[in-house]
Design a protein with these regions (language model features):
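Surface-exposed molecular-recognition determinants
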Residues: 2-188
């Protein structure tokens, strides 16, 4: 392929179903108490967050990832989780809470340099006629003692989502090299 054809092919407009990178955050030395994406535009139908995360929590091999939309910390959220670690299955629910417990992530008690991975889909984030929902898949491998979890969340608000804030459930900081990437998904 000639260089001109390659440039032409790579410069096409996004098609329905394509994911476009909106923003990324990589936590620097010293960690970060939170990560927030702000001023999210309305060019997409759905959002997706892909993250690899580790926190400073030392009380267990995992920590939780919390999500709040548009700065709302009132009891307008609900969430569900099912998962397991290869030996034990679990199911959890939270209703009328101030955040969505969105994922299990690695903690400082997990093996050295181990990060949890999660993919979170925020559906119809700009639709002002319905509450906002998300679904997620998360996992941690800890030398054979891993954890896998599927979850969903609800924000009982019809406002378009313009910001997403991530914090820890038990820890106080995301560790250096934790990485969050926000994508927008086009639709027809």
């Amino acid at each position: 392929m000639s260089p001109i054809l390659g440039i032409w092919a790579s410069s096409r407009a996004a098609a329905a179903g394509d994911y476009e990178s909106i923003a990324t955050v990589t936590v620097g030395s010293g960690g970060a108490a939170n990560v927030e994406f702000t001023s999210i535009g309305t060019d997409w139908t759905h959002l997706q967050v892909r993250a690899i995360v580790r926190t400073n929590y030392t009380g267990a091999n995992s920590d939780g990832l919390k999500i709040n939309f548009n700065g709302d910390t009132a009891n307008n959220y609900a969430w569900h989780q099912v998962g397991g670690n290869g030996a034990t299955a679990f199911a959890q629910v939270g209703s009328t809470t101030g955040t969505i417990y969105a994922a299990y992530i690695a903690s400082n008690s997990t093996g050295s340099n181990t990060f949890g991975a999660t993919i979170i889909d925020v559906l119809d984030y700009r639709n002002t006629n319905k509450y906002k929902t998300l679904r997620n898949l998360t996992g941690i491998d800890n030398n054979g003692n891993g954890l896998l979890m599927l979850g969903s969340g609800l924000w009982q608000n019809t406002n378009a989502i313009t910001s997403i804030k991530f914090t820890q459930w038990d820890g106080t900081s995301f560790n250096q090299h934790s990485h969050f990437a926000l994508y927008g998904c086009k639709s027809a």
